[in-house]
Amino acid sequence: MKQEPQQQQPAQQPPPAGAGVPAFLSKLWALVGEAPSNQLITWSQNGQSFLVLDEQRFAKEILPKYFKHNNMASFVRQLNMYGFRKVVHVDSGIVKLERDGLVEFQHPYFKQGREDLLEHIKRKVSSSRPEENKISQEDLSKIISSAQKVEIKQETIESRLSALKRENESLWREVAELRAKHLKQQQVIRKIVQFIVTLVQNNQLVSLKRKRPLLLNTNGPTKSNVFQQIVKEPADNNNHVPLNRTEGLKQREQISDDIIIYDVTEDVADEENTMVDEENAPITPETNEDTTSDSSNCSRSPDIVIVEDDNEEEYAPVIQGDKSTESVAVSANDPLSPVSDSTSPLMSSAVQLNNQSTLTAEDPVSMMDSILNENGVISQNINLLGKVELLDYLDSIDCSLEDFQAMLSGRQFSIDPDLLFDLFTSSVQMNPTDHIPNTKMETKGIETTKSNAGPAASQETQVSKPKSDKQLIQYTAFPLLAFLDGNPGSTVESGSSATETPSSVDKPLEVDELLESSLDPEPTQSKLVRLEPLTEAEASEATLFYLCELAPAPMDTDMPFLDN
């Protein structure tokens, strides 16, 4: 009964196309409102939705009339595209099953009698829009352009990296070459040092073959007698004049190899008496087998050994002589011999007044000869040189060093790496107070005599002025040669006061007393400084080192030589 009034209503015509309503909505509005189709599709009782009574018949009979298909699924999909939703009836939480296949669809703007609301029903738009696609294309073009720029920069960076790699490789090769050159230079320097040390060690070994007594032993083997040059210096004259004299008070076999000069006490009267007795005493020459063979050299090569004895009671000078020399008595009235006159400039230049002097145990001339010449031989005809000759001699030494360098550049030598460490770390470091003498002890020296006194000098003048001919004389050694000889040490004596040399002995001793003192089983402790014999020519060459004013090297202590 309710459907009859709906069938009597006139059929609603679809809105014109110009109204902006989609064709699907217009067809749907006409389909629901037409009377012939009300049996299959119709409005609901409240007019807010429409119902499909029989889906199969509706798909076969109604859909082909309004649409180009008879597929119910396509119709439902189109309804969903415009926002229609399927209505589900729920009674007490249970879905009401449609026996007859009733399906209800609902839209807020699709209502019965409200055709004007159809304009508000819009089809859903897809998520992808062409504008958005255009924007993404622009972004893509930007990304592509930026990627191209990055690629160009990357190529530039790669080229720079390759250049840096090549430069780095060249630098490493250069560093390796420089390291190799540096290593070779170090090896050359080590070989040079090794060669120099070898020369010094060879020279030292040669010098060790000479017979030398122990420094702390006063008894030793016999030794050839030599002339002793005693320098006497008058009070009014500063020139040192050497005098050849033989004053042997002991036999060579019974005394030490070295000359012993005992310190003189401060008793002035005993000194005066001793000076008178000494000049009037006979001189006994010594005989030895070595004297006959070496008399010519020994007469010109003094062997001076200074012994400082702790015994303060007895003092006696022992001076060696050659058997070929006549026994003479030297007095204040006797003139000087021609030999002493010829060697007076030598001794005046060789003996210097130096408050900071030290002593060496090796012959400086022979040491320098062994360095400059491999065979250790130098001409014996070198006389006393002047300033010009001295400069020429030093130039010759420089030339020898240049030849030395040229010889080193053309030869190969082996070197021990440990030797350099021992060479530069074996220097002796001693306490400067170890060798400072006691202020109460007497210093040792060389007796000085009058020079150019002449026959007019009388003995009374000597007695009246016993201390007028005493001079402070010290011996200056050679530190460079002492270091090369392998005996470095500290200074023997240092201080503000100069060393004093006694001119005479305290008491004259007889030959028997000297023999008894030499046979003493417990000899007193003494300090020895050994000087090897020098010829006249060698002594003249030694003057060069005094003119150079080389600082001396100490020899109080025995130092080990460099190891091979």
UniProtKB/Swiss-Prot annotation:
Tell me the subunit arrangement.
Homotrimer.
**Region Hydrophobic repeat HR-C: start-end pairs:** 390-415
What SUPFAM superfamilies does UniProt report for this protein, alphabetically?
Winged helix' DNA-binding domain
Cite a GO CC annotation. Answer: chromatin
Give the species: Gallus gallus
DNA-binding region as annotated in the record = 21-126
State what protein this is by name: Heat shock factor protein 2
Question: Region entry Hydrophobic repeat HR-A/B: which residue ranges?
Answer: 133-206
The record's principal subcellular location, in a coarse class, is cytoplasm
Keywords noted in UniProt: Activator, Cytoplasm, DNA-binding, Nucleus, Phosphoprotein, Stress response, Transcription, Transcription regulation
Localization (cell): Cytoplasm; Nucleus
Instruction: Give me the ranges of the annotated region Disordered.
Output: 271-301, 320-347, 448-468
